[in-house]
């Protein structure tokens, strides 16, 4: 199926609908028949009504039209949305390569250009620890979007991945805007996992600024949302960060318990990337005490 008419016919027959049912409130049956036979194209408002009659989104229609195969752009966005931590450098590099291939054919695609730049910025921050150069790489994105009266879903997807590259004040401002926008999209997209990640990552800034009590506040919010909605991976990451904060606050035994719990849960879930990320973060924040902590993901814990 490579055209609109054949795809409409395939969907209609698959749903056991008559042509009259398919075109209800959209156009006459005779005109609908011409669309299925690829003789005319429907106007956008009538096409939308036909899709409503099919209980189908435009995105799904295009997916079916391509024989249930994602387009190169959709594949990039799928991989981009699955990135959990900035430490997944192999995945970041792979998606950058796919962006480069796509942009050779579609050089004016602003969104994919933003995705590519955001991933390059993340790599500079993660591998080279060069936040200045990373900010230079992505600054144009925020410069453009900061002037927008509304942030849309693709804007959210990019900004949630790069806000940590900016200076603290700018980063916190970006997160606040993203949280507001996420609430608007909660009935259309799965926003809670993103909200959890934003709170956990903003806590990182606060830890670096030694604002431990405020960091703990956002971490507790993350843990609550994660537990209520069964986001176990995000739960692990938030619990680990809670342990770090408690340790910084002088509650060393309690902090160790939470860090040990995060490591153990990640191990049980067989999430090796998350386990490695948690270890790296503990080592980064508590490097001087790492031997004294004697953490081990194999240690049994009381959940």
Region locations from a protein language model:
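Amphipathic alpha-helical segments of tetratricopeptide repeats
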Residues: 97-104, 139-146, 179-187, 219-231, ...
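Helix-turn-helix repeat elements of alpha-solenoid scaffolds
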Residues: 85-100, 128-139, 168-180, 209-220, ...
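A short, Lys/Arg-rich alpha-helix, primarily the initiator
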Residues: 1-14
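DNA major-groove recognition helix of helix-turn-helix/homeodomain DNA-binding modules
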Residues: 45-60
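Residue register of alpha-helical TPR repeats
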Residues: 113-116, 153, 157, 197, ...
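Short alpha-helical DNA-recognition segment
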Residues: 16-34
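Structural register within alpha-helical repeat arrays
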Residues: 120-121, 158-162, 202, 242
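Charged, helix-prone or intrinsically disordered regulatory segments positioned adjacent to compact structured domains
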Residues: 57-136
């Amino acid at each position: 199926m490579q055209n609109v008419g054949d795809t409409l016919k395939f969907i209609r027959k698959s749903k056991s609908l008559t042509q009259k049912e398919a075109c209800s409130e959209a156009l006459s049956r005779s005109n609908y028949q011409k669309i299925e036979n690829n003789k005319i194209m429907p106007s956008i408002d009538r096409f939308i009504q036909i899709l409503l009659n099919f209980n189908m989104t435009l995105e799904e229609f295009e997916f079916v039209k391509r024989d249930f195969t994602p387009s190169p752009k959709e594949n990039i966005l799928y991989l981009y949305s699955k990135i959990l931590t900035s430490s997944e450098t192999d995945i970041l590099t792979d998606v950058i390569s796919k962006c480069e291939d796509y942009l050779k054919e579609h050089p004016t695609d602003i969104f994919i250009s933003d995705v590519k730049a955001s991933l390059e910025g993340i790599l500079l921050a993660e591998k080279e620890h060069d936040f200045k150069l990373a900010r230079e790489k992505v600054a144009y994105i925020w410069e453009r979007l900061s002037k927008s009266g509304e942030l849309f879903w693709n804007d959210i997807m990019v900004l949630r991945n790069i806000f940590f590259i900016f200076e603290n004040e700018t980063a916190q401002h970006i997160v606040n805007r993203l949280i507001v926008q996420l609430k608007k999209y909660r009935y259309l997209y799965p926003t809670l996992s993103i909200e959890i990640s934003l709170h956990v990552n903003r806590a990182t800034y606060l830890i670096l600024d030694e604002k431990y009590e405020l960091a703990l506040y956002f971490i507790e919010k993350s843990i609550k949302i994660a537990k209520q909605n069964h986001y176990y991976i995000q739960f692990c990451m938030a619990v680990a960060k809670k342990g770090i904060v408690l340790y910084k606050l002088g509650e060393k035994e309690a902090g160790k318990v939470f860090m040990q719990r995060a490591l153990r849960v990640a191990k049980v879930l067989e999430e090796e990337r998350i386990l490695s990320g948690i270890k790296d973060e503990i080592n980064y924040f508590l490097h001087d005490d790492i031997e004294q902590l004697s953490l081990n993901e194999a240690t049994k814990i009381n959940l």
